[in-house]
Design a protein with these regions (language model features):
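Extended non-transmembrane interhelical loops and adjacent amphipathic helices
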Residues: 71, 86-119
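Membrane-interface alpha-helices at helix entry/exit sites of multi-pass transporters
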Residues: 82-87, 104-106, 116-133, 270-283
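Transmembrane helix boundary and interhelical junction motifs in multipass membrane proteins
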Residues: 63-67, 99-109, 136, 245-263, ...
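Predominantly cytoplasmic-facing regulatory/coupling regions of multi-pass membrane proteins
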Residues: 1-90, 146-247, 278-279, 286-338
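Transmembrane helix-loop junction
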Residues: 74-75, 97, 114, 224-225, ...
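Hydrophobic alpha-helical transmembrane segments of ABC transporter permease domains
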Residues: 128-150
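Interfacial segments of multi-pass membrane proteins
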Residues: 112-120, 238, 242, 259-279
């Protein structure tokens, strides 16, 4: 069940152009003004230990998100392990890091759909995506309550989420006692399965909650790296700001938009504009680097698991990844201490 995915020339050119523009900006930050250049300088001055802690939290979030998909897919007849699910999710994150317009999300959808053999698998996968989104809305609503109470965000996103959750509950109640008579009806497969098994629903919500908590942990580490007071409280404000900024991804990895959202949330927490901007840039940089590394490893894992791949390829890929991580950690953390 390892799909062959094809990309049009337009998609490839769009991705290469976006990445090229980001490289130009990264190599010449003065193009964006003195404030951005100073913010990039602030990123280079922080302790790499906190950045590695944030990277580990991002990896946890990616893996947990893949497991959330697997928990819903398994109830719909999907045949995949948690490791396989995390790898498929990671490939989508890899593409999202280098391509705009959430191209990676479409690829992720295709990869997960290949784990189903029944008719209407695309509809079923769509329902799984909707169920994962509904579970994510629960945790996002909790963060939005905190952000709204702090005066960082308005109340209308919370009202929208309440409507989404109410609609989800209604769909689950309707889907419980219905059976699919057409392909489109398979969109309710996930809701039907989760409604009949509260344990499965709790497992899905738990995995999504772990992913959300890991992202909050990453934001906490970044805030601590820049000396932000009460970094956990600051991170709780960053979470909903990032989710709202991610609704429309115009750049690879949502770089720029995400950094601005983080800077806005931290500034509302009382952080100076320069430090807030540096923290936003650091968050986006670490998240993008983690997505690239985790996604590349995921792609190698899926390739090594294919029937046509040589048996030694998985071991070679794992060994190369371990050596690369050890070298990077030694160069950024251990060597400066010597």
């Amino acid at each position: 069940m390892h799909p062959s995915l094809h990309f049009s020339t337009r998609h490839l050119l769009l991705s290469l152009g976006s990445v090229g523009a980001l490289i130009v900006i990264a190599s010449s930050p003065q193009l964006l003004g003195d404030r951005v250049g100073a913010a990039l300088g602030g990123v280079l001055a922080v302790s790499p230990v906190w950045l590695w802690a944030a990277a580990l939290a991002f990896v946890t979030s990616l893996a947990a998100s893949g497991c959330a998909w697997r928990s819903a897919l398994a109830r719909c007849g999907g045949d995949l392990s948690r490791t396989d699910a995390a790898a498929r999710y990671g490939v989508g994150s890899l593409l999202n890091a280098v391509a705009p317009a959430k191209l990676g999300s479409a690829v992720r959808f295709a990869l997960f759909s290949r784990t189903l053999d029944a008719d209407g698998r695309l509809w079923t996968t769509g329902g799984v995506a909707a169920s994962v989104g509904a579970a994510r809305s629960i945790w996002l609503a909790l963060l939005l309550v905190f952000a709204a109470a702090s005066g960082v965000l308005p109340l209308w996103p919370l009202a929208v989420l309440a409507g989404v959750l109410a609609l989800t509950v209604a769909v689950a109640l309707v889907a419980r006692d219905t059976s699919p008579n057409a392909r489109a009806a398979h969109a309710l497969d996930a809701f039907r399965a989760l409604r009949r098994s509260p344990r499965a629903a709790a497992e899905l919500v738990g995995w999504v909650g772990l992913a959300a908590a890991a992202r909050v942990g990453a934001a906490t580490a970044i805030a601590a790296a820049f000396g932000v007071d009460q970094p956990l409280l600051a991170a709780l404000l960053v979470g909903p700001a990032l989710d709202l900024a991610g609704l429309l991804q115009l750049t690879p990895g949502n770089i720029g938009v995400a950094s601005a959202a983080i800077a806005f949330a931290l500034h509302a927490h009382g952080v100076g504009s320069g430090t807030a901007l540096s923290a936003g840039i650091a968050f986006s940089a670490v998240e993008t680097a983690t997505s690239l590394a985790f996604g590349t490893g995921s792609a190698l894992f899926l390739f090594a698991g294919a029937r046509t791949a040589p048996r030694w390829s998985l071991a070679a890929a794992g060994a190369t990844a371990c050596v690369g991580l050890a070298a990077a950690f030694g160069a950024t953390v251990v060597l400066p201490l010597v």
